[in-house]
């Protein structure tokens, strides 16, 4: 996150003075927690690749009249690394590529096509290497399903819930959009500023089209929004006062959100207490039906299934998106008599009642009454075989 913020600052320096550029980098740090990024969502790891790619792409698209092929290729390879972490950045990567190709329009159609193909290959190279590694071990079909098919088989949330999440996200990001508005409405934009605004449009378009609107899906938006805010801050009255007020609100909100998360989900002490319930020496792997999968790692336990994220087996939206019936997989796991089964109360709000009923039947037949431990605002239940 620190590296991403620094690269944002360096990128913003190309479109704004030092003070507003510092504001852009700090704004990213302050807003990450508000979008559930303080726990390490995937954008925290791929955003650094994207902001580095953006800097290179901006140079090719705005300063190099003939479009430097090697620099553009490096940008697209960085995009490819980000894509292999998560595919959400495809629209942004496509925008970078098209913007750079536009800079080469005077080179002729043949040069544009050949360069475009090279850049596409570089962007797809990390994914191709990952697929090859899986295919070489006989898991090519599983890679294909998990990466390209399952997302389209998830059950969508209700429109009302999606709309509520969208409004919440807009509210959270609105202070930065307010600061950046002068940059958006300005009639005198440099090539670099236009590039950043185009980047923002590409990121926003994917975010809106993808749907679901969980907070962490807005984390990639923070990159162009922070740079646009830096540009806007340079064009408003009393920029220091505005920057101090916005960053102050952001910092307070960030600390508050992190505190709420700790109270609702627990902290290090909670994790240590829960981990003590696991026995890594037992050959019967534990099964976390509901809870944090990091407990497998912290307890050095074996894994009962390839579906180690609890939502894969307990969430309604994943019921048709994992390639197997949730209930059949739960029964398969329970036939191995896990040394420990962990669930939480109250139940997960989006829990699949049919999956829960399958688990409860197994617990009633083969497991003792549970041990109960506090888990933030919920209670962890640990079942052991009779």
Model-derived regions, located:
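Hydrophobic/aromatic-rich transmembrane helices and adjacent perimembrane loops
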Residues: 91, 208-240
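Short periplasmic/luminal acceptor-recognition loop of GT-C membrane glycosyltransferases, typified by
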Residues: 94, 264-319, 323-353, 376
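Transmembrane-helix signature of polytopic, membrane-embedded enzymes
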Residues: 5-30, 47, 64-67
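Membrane-interface transmembrane helices that cradle and orient dolichyl/undecaprenyl
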Residues: 16-19, 53-74, 106, 176-191, ...
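Membrane-interface alpha helices of multi-pass inner-membrane proteins
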Residues: 33, 68-87, 93-98, 125, ...
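Short acidic/glycine- and proline-prone juxtamembrane loop motifs at membrane-interface regions
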Residues: 38-46, 215
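Specific aromatic-rich, kink-prone transmembrane helix
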Residues: 5-7, 46-65, 71-74, 78-79, ...
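Hydrophobic, aromatic-rich transmembrane alpha-helices
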Residues: 168-204
């Amino acid at each position: 996150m620190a590296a991403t913020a620094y690269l944002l600052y360096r990128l913003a320096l190309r479109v704004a003075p030092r003070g507003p550029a510092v504001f852009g980098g700090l704004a990213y740090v302050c807003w990450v927690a508000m979008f559930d990024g303080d726990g390490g969502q995937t954008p925290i790891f791929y955003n650094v690749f994207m902001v580095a790619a953006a800097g290179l792409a901006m140079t090719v698209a705005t300063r190099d009249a003939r479009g430097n092929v090697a620099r553009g290729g490096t940008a697209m390879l960085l995009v490819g690394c980000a894509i292999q972490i998560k595919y959400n950045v495809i629209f942004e990567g496509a925008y970078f590529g098209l913007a750079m190709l536009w800079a080469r329009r005077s080179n002729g159609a043949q040069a544009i096509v050949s360069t475009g193909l090279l850049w596409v290959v570089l962007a797809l190279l990390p994914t191709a290497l990952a697929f090859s590694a899986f295919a070489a071990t006989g898991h090519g079909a599983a890679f294909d399903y998990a990466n390209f098919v399952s997302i389209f088989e998830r059950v969508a949330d209700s429109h009302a819930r999606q709309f509520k999440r969208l409004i919440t996200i807009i509210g959270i990001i609105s202070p930065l959009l307010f600061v950046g508005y002068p940059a958006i409405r300005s009639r005198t934009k440099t090539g670099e500023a236009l590039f950043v605004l185009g980047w923002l449009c590409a990121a926003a378009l994917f975010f809106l089209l993808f749907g679901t609107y969980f907070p962490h899906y807005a984390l990639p938006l923070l990159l162009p929004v922070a740079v646009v805010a830096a540009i806007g801050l340079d064009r408003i009255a009393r920029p220091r006062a505005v920057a101090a007020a916005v960053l102050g609100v952001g910092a307070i909100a960030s600390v508050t959100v992190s505190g709420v998360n700790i109270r609702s989900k627990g902290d290090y002490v909670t994790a240590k207490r829960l981990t003590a319930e696991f026995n890594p020496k037992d050959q019967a792997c534990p099964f976390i039906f509901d809870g944090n999968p990091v407990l497998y790692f912290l307890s050095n336990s074996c894994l009962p299934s390839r579906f180690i994220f609890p939502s894969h087996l307990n969430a309604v939206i994943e019921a048709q998106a994992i390639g197997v019936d949730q209930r059949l997989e739960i029964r398969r796991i329970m036939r191995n008599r896990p040394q420990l089964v962990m669930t939480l109360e109250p139940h997960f709000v989006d829990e699949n009642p049919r999956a829960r009923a399958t688990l409860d039947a197994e617990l009633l037949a083969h497991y003792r009454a549970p041990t109960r431990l506090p888990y933030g605002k919920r209670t962890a239940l640990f079942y052991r075989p009779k």
